[in-house]
Protein backbone atom coordinates (compact mmCIF):
# COMPACT_ATOMS: atom_id res chain seq x y z
CA UNK A 1 0.00 0.00 0.00
CA UNK A 2 1.57 3.35 -0.99
CA UNK A 3 2.08 5.71 1.94
CA UNK A 4 3.10 9.37 2.00
CA UNK A 5 5.94 8.78 4.44
CA UNK A 6 9.33 10.36 4.98
CA UNK A 7 12.03 9.04 7.28
CA UNK A 8 13.99 11.11 9.80
CA UNK A 9 17.59 10.16 10.53
CA UNK A 10 19.22 10.21 13.95
CA UNK A 11 20.65 13.72 14.19
CA UNK A 12 22.88 13.51 17.26
CA UNK A 13 26.46 13.68 15.99
CA UNK A 14 29.49 15.87 16.53
CA UNK A 15 30.62 15.40 12.92
CA UNK A 16 28.80 16.09 9.64
CA UNK A 17 29.76 12.91 7.78
CA UNK A 18 27.34 10.47 9.50
CA UNK A 19 24.46 12.89 9.02
CA UNK A 20 25.32 13.50 5.38
CA UNK A 21 25.51 9.75 4.70
CA UNK A 22 22.02 9.22 6.10
CA UNK A 23 20.62 12.08 4.03
CA UNK A 24 22.30 10.65 0.94
CA UNK A 25 20.65 7.30 1.74
CA UNK A 26 17.22 8.92 1.57
CA UNK A 27 16.44 10.48 4.95
CA UNK A 28 14.25 13.56 4.63
CA UNK A 29 15.34 15.27 7.84
CA UNK A 30 17.26 14.93 11.10
CA UNK A 31 15.93 14.19 14.59
CA UNK A 32 17.68 15.34 17.76
CA UNK A 33 16.47 13.44 20.84
CA UNK A 34 17.43 13.87 24.48
CA UNK A 35 17.83 10.11 24.97
CA UNK A 36 20.87 10.05 22.68
CA UNK A 37 22.13 13.59 23.07
CA UNK A 38 20.38 16.95 22.72
CA UNK A 39 23.52 18.87 23.64
CA UNK A 40 24.91 22.05 22.10
CA UNK A 41 27.40 20.34 19.79
CA UNK A 42 24.87 17.89 18.35
CA UNK A 43 22.18 20.52 17.92
CA UNK A 44 24.46 22.99 16.17
CA UNK A 45 25.91 20.30 13.90
CA UNK A 46 22.47 19.04 12.88
CA UNK A 47 21.34 22.56 12.05
CA UNK A 48 24.48 23.23 10.00
CA UNK A 49 24.03 20.05 7.97
CA UNK A 50 20.29 20.64 7.57
CA UNK A 51 20.87 24.16 6.27
CA UNK A 52 23.45 22.87 3.80
CA UNK A 53 21.08 20.19 2.47
CA UNK A 54 17.78 22.12 2.81
CA UNK A 55 16.09 19.68 5.21
CA UNK A 56 14.38 20.11 8.57
CA UNK A 57 15.69 19.38 12.07
CA UNK A 58 13.21 17.99 14.59
CA UNK A 59 14.13 18.67 18.20
CA UNK A 60 13.21 16.77 21.36
CA UNK A 61 14.95 18.99 23.91
CA UNK A 62 16.95 18.09 27.03
CA UNK A 63 14.30 17.18 29.59
CA UNK A 64 16.73 16.83 32.50
CA UNK A 65 18.41 20.14 31.62
CA UNK A 66 21.77 18.38 31.94
CA UNK A 67 23.42 19.78 28.83
CA UNK A 68 21.21 22.74 27.99
CA UNK A 69 18.61 24.90 29.68
CA UNK A 70 15.85 26.32 27.50
CA UNK A 71 17.75 29.61 27.20
CA UNK A 72 20.84 27.68 26.07
CA UNK A 73 18.82 25.82 23.45
CA UNK A 74 17.54 29.11 22.05
CA UNK A 75 21.08 30.47 22.00
CA UNK A 76 22.40 27.45 20.06
CA UNK A 77 19.51 27.57 17.58
CA UNK A 78 20.46 31.22 17.01
CA UNK A 79 17.50 32.16 14.87
CA UNK A 80 17.71 29.14 12.58
CA UNK A 81 14.49 27.37 11.62
CA UNK A 82 13.71 24.20 13.57
CA UNK A 83 10.71 22.00 14.40
CA UNK A 84 10.38 21.63 18.18
CA UNK A 85 8.52 18.52 19.35
CA UNK A 86 6.62 18.11 22.63
CA UNK A 87 5.52 21.69 23.23
CA UNK A 88 3.22 20.30 25.89
CA UNK A 89 2.92 19.20 29.50
CA UNK A 90 4.61 15.83 29.12
CA UNK A 91 6.43 13.73 26.53
CA UNK A 92 9.85 15.17 27.24
CA UNK A 93 11.81 18.30 26.62
CA UNK A 94 12.90 21.08 28.94
CA UNK A 95 11.09 20.83 32.26
CA UNK A 96 9.22 22.82 33.39
CA UNK A 97 9.58 25.56 30.76
CA UNK A 98 9.57 23.89 27.33
CA UNK A 99 6.60 26.10 26.42
CA UNK A 100 9.10 28.96 26.23
CA UNK A 101 9.89 27.71 22.73
CA UNK A 102 6.36 28.57 21.56
CA UNK A 103 6.06 32.00 20.03
CA UNK A 104 9.62 32.24 18.71
CA UNK A 105 9.38 33.33 15.06
CA UNK A 106 11.91 30.74 13.84
CA UNK A 107 10.59 27.75 15.82
CA UNK A 108 7.84 25.56 14.35
CA UNK A 109 6.04 23.80 17.18
CA UNK A 110 4.01 20.65 17.66
CA UNK A 111 2.51 18.61 20.47
CA UNK A 112 1.57 14.96 20.67
CA UNK A 113 -2.02 13.78 20.78
CA UNK A 114 -2.24 12.00 24.18
CA UNK A 115 -2.15 15.35 25.99
CA UNK A 116 -5.03 17.07 24.20
CA UNK A 117 -7.75 17.91 24.79
CA UNK A 118 -6.91 18.02 28.50
CA UNK A 119 -9.36 15.94 30.52
CA UNK A 120 -10.05 14.36 33.87
CA UNK A 121 -7.64 11.42 33.56
CA UNK A 122 -5.00 12.88 31.23
CA UNK A 123 -2.32 13.48 33.87
CA UNK A 124 -2.83 10.14 35.62
CA UNK A 125 -2.50 8.23 32.37
CA UNK A 126 0.83 9.82 31.52
CA UNK A 127 2.64 8.85 34.72
CA UNK A 128 2.19 5.17 33.88
CA UNK A 129 3.04 5.82 30.24
CA UNK A 130 6.35 7.50 31.11
CA UNK A 131 7.34 4.67 33.45
CA UNK A 132 6.61 2.04 30.79
CA UNK A 133 8.24 3.73 27.80
CA UNK A 134 11.41 4.73 29.64
CA UNK A 135 11.69 1.49 31.65
CA UNK A 136 11.41 3.25 35.00
CA UNK A 137 10.69 1.57 38.32
CA UNK A 138 8.09 3.25 40.49
CA UNK A 139 9.69 1.73 43.62
CA UNK A 140 12.95 3.63 43.02
CA UNK A 141 12.75 7.22 44.34
CA UNK A 142 14.83 8.66 41.51
CA UNK A 143 12.76 6.96 38.83
CA UNK A 144 9.50 7.97 40.49
CA UNK A 145 10.63 11.60 40.72
CA UNK A 146 11.66 11.60 37.07
CA UNK A 147 8.20 10.40 36.03
CA UNK A 148 6.48 13.00 38.22
CA UNK A 149 8.62 15.84 36.86
CA UNK A 150 7.74 14.88 33.31
CA UNK A 151 3.98 15.11 33.86
CA UNK A 152 2.82 18.71 34.39
CA UNK A 153 -1.00 19.01 34.41
CA UNK A 154 -1.13 22.82 34.40
CA UNK A 155 1.07 22.91 31.32
CA UNK A 156 -1.13 20.32 29.62
CA UNK A 157 -4.14 22.54 30.20
CA UNK A 158 -2.29 25.57 28.81
CA UNK A 159 -1.34 23.56 25.72
CA UNK A 160 -4.96 23.51 24.55
CA UNK A 161 -5.23 27.30 24.66
CA UNK A 162 -1.85 27.80 22.97
CA UNK A 163 -3.10 25.63 20.12
CA UNK A 164 -6.17 27.83 19.75
CA UNK A 165 -4.02 30.97 19.79
CA UNK A 166 -1.88 29.53 17.00
CA UNK A 167 1.32 29.37 19.07
CA UNK A 168 1.48 25.59 18.62
CA UNK A 169 1.35 24.92 14.91
CA UNK A 170 1.02 21.15 14.50
CA UNK A 171 -0.50 18.05 16.07
CA UNK A 172 1.43 14.78 15.94
CA UNK A 173 1.28 11.21 17.15
CA UNK A 174 4.96 10.62 18.02
CA UNK A 175 5.56 6.87 18.40
CA UNK A 176 5.73 4.05 20.93
CA UNK A 177 4.05 4.87 24.26
CA UNK A 178 3.72 8.61 23.78
CA UNK A 179 1.77 8.54 20.56
CA UNK A 180 -1.40 7.09 19.08
CA UNK A 181 -1.10 7.41 15.33
CA UNK A 182 -4.73 6.49 14.72
CA UNK A 183 -6.04 9.28 16.96
CA UNK A 184 -4.25 12.37 15.69
CA UNK A 185 -6.98 13.80 13.47
CA UNK A 186 -9.79 12.77 15.82
CA UNK A 187 -8.15 14.41 18.83
CA UNK A 188 -7.30 17.49 16.79
CA UNK A 189 -10.95 17.97 15.92
CA UNK A 190 -11.97 17.22 19.51
CA UNK A 191 -9.64 19.97 20.65
CA UNK A 192 -11.24 22.39 18.19
CA UNK A 193 -14.64 21.56 19.70
CA UNK A 194 -13.39 21.97 23.27
CA UNK A 195 -11.82 25.33 22.45
CA UNK A 196 -15.02 26.54 20.80
CA UNK A 197 -16.91 25.79 24.01
CA UNK A 198 -14.20 27.30 26.21
CA UNK A 199 -13.27 30.39 24.20
CA UNK A 200 -16.33 31.01 22.07
CA UNK A 201 -17.03 30.90 18.37
CA UNK A 202 -14.53 32.52 16.02
CA UNK A 203 -17.26 34.08 13.86
CA UNK A 204 -20.69 33.43 12.44
CA UNK A 205 -19.79 29.76 11.96
CA UNK A 206 -17.07 27.29 12.94
CA UNK A 207 -15.46 26.98 9.51
CA UNK A 208 -12.43 29.13 10.27
CA UNK A 209 -11.55 27.22 13.42
CA UNK A 210 -12.15 23.86 11.72
CA UNK A 211 -9.79 24.78 8.88
CA UNK A 212 -7.12 26.04 11.28
CA UNK A 213 -7.20 22.80 13.23
CA UNK A 214 -7.28 20.69 10.07
CA UNK A 215 -4.13 22.52 8.95
CA UNK A 216 -2.35 21.41 12.14
CA UNK A 217 -2.42 17.80 10.92
CA UNK A 218 -2.11 18.38 7.16
CA UNK A 219 -0.59 21.39 5.41
CA UNK A 220 1.39 22.73 8.38
CA UNK A 221 3.48 19.56 8.83
CA UNK A 222 3.94 19.36 5.06
CA UNK A 223 5.29 22.91 4.96
CA UNK A 224 7.48 22.32 8.02
CA UNK A 225 9.18 19.35 6.37
CA UNK A 226 9.47 20.71 2.85
CA UNK A 227 6.99 18.38 1.17
CA UNK A 228 4.04 20.74 0.71
CA UNK A 229 4.59 20.71 -3.06
CA UNK A 230 3.47 17.05 -3.04
CA UNK A 231 1.13 16.56 -0.05
CA UNK A 232 -0.74 18.39 2.68
CA UNK A 233 -3.70 19.84 0.79
CA UNK A 234 -6.16 18.96 -1.95
CA UNK A 235 -4.76 20.75 -5.00
CA UNK A 236 -4.23 19.96 -8.65
CA UNK A 237 -0.84 18.36 -9.18
CA UNK A 238 -0.42 17.00 -5.66
CA UNK A 239 -0.51 13.37 -4.58
CA UNK A 240 -4.04 12.32 -3.65
CA UNK A 241 -4.80 12.52 0.06
CA UNK A 242 -8.48 11.66 -0.27
CA UNK A 243 -10.64 9.47 -2.49
CA UNK A 244 -14.37 10.03 -3.05
CA UNK A 245 -16.50 7.13 -4.11
CA UNK A 246 -20.14 6.10 -4.19
CA UNK A 247 -20.65 2.74 -2.48
CA UNK A 248 -22.55 0.27 -4.64
Mark where each language-model region is.
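Alpha-helix-loop-beta-strand connector modules within alpha/beta enzyme cores
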Residues: 1-3, 49-59
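Residue-level detector of anion-binding/catalytic polar loops
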Residues: 4, 28, 55-56, 108, ...
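Acidic, glycine-enriched loop/beta-strand segments at the rims
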Residues: 214, 222-248
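Alpha-helical segments flanking ligand/cofactor-binding loops in enzyme cores
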Residues: 20, 44-48, 160, 235
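Metal-cofactor-binding active-site regions of metalloenzymes
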Residues: 1-17, 34-35, 228
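Divalent metal-coordination and catalytic microenvironments
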Residues: 5, 11, 30, 60, ...
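Flexible, glycine/charged-enriched surface loops at secondary-structure junctions
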Residues: 4-6, 58-60, 200-202, 231-233
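Active-site neighborhoods of metal-dependent hydrolases
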Residues: 17-39, 63-74, 79-213, 225
Amino acid sequence: VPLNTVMLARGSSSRPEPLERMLAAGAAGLKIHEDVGANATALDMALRVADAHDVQVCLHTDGLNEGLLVEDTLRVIDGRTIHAFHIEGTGGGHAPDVMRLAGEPNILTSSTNPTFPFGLNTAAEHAAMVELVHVLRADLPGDAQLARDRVRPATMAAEDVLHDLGLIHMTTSDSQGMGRIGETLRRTMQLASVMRDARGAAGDDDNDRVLRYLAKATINPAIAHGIAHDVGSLEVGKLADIVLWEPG
